[in-house]
Amino acid sequence: MLRKPIIAGNWKMNKNPQEAKAFVEAVASKLPSTDLVDVAVAAPAVDLVTTIEAAKDSVLKVAAQNCYFENTGAFTGETSPKVLAEMGADYVVIGHSERRDYFHETDEDINKKAKAIFANGLTPIVCCGESLETYEAGKAVEFVGAQVSAALAGLSAEQVASLVLAYEPIWAIGTGKSATQDDAQNMCKAVRDVVAADFGQEVADKVRVQYGGSVKPENVKDYMACPDVDGALVGGASLEADSFLALLDFLN
């Protein structure tokens, strides 16, 4: 089953609107055809309007980095998935380890968000990943499998087939440590196996699984050569236009 790769940059809490616009203008005309790869950037909420506007005539897709699971209401400081859709966003990243860790998001929250994102016609990029402690204890597969099952509970097979799963070992995010090619393949396959167990092999063959965690132009080819790695969710290397474009060289 040929799955189209997806490379997504996660800017985290970086860039003001002017910097976001300059970045999009620098990369937009240089991106490969959408027949080959989907390319997205996840911009901070304060940059979304500018980023979406700057990207609108290009193949670059735009993701929000989070949303709430209600469309409107007394939820001070939250972002409405309905409004994200109206603004023209394509994806929403949910379940990132920084959200789970610093903002105490639970698997149940992430599941509710996934449902709300689909209800508004957007596509979730659902993150999962284990700590160094869990990894060293040999419990990564079990831990990440439980995260994935919980995040996808109650979604339809069609929804699951269309979403993106991003496996990011927490010990490799922004640490300069990256998972080996074997680690990435084994864990992305484990994620796909959970989808197969919960939704059937046909759905598992369609769902795209990204690897994230210190991905850079120098190692992206190795990860993309893995049969179960369909893309990358990239932090630091997505902040500069040149390094972001260099991530796409794996196509050559």
From Swiss-Prot:
Its EC number is 5.3.1.1. It comes from the Bacteria. InterPro entries: Aldolase_TIM, TIM_sf, TrioseP_Isoase_bac/euk, Triosephosphate_isomerase, Triosephosphate_isomerase_AS. GO terms for molecular function: triose-phosphate isomerase activity. It is an enzyme of class 5 (isomerase). Keywords: Cytoplasm, Gluconeogenesis, Glycolysis, Isomerase. Gene3D superfamilies: Aldolase class I. The keyword Cytoplasm applies. Its main location: cytoplasm. The active site is at H96 (electrophile), E168 (proton acceptor). CDD domains: TIM (cd00311). One of its GO terms (biological process) is glycolytic process. The keyword Hydrolase does not apply. It is found in: Cytoplasm. GO terms for cellular component: cytosol. It catalyses: D-glyceraldehyde 3-phosphate = dihydroxyacetone phosphate. PANTHER family: TRIOSEPHOSPHATE ISOMERASE. Homodimer. HAMAP family: TIM_B. Belongs to the triosephosphate isomerase family. This is Triosephosphate isomerase.
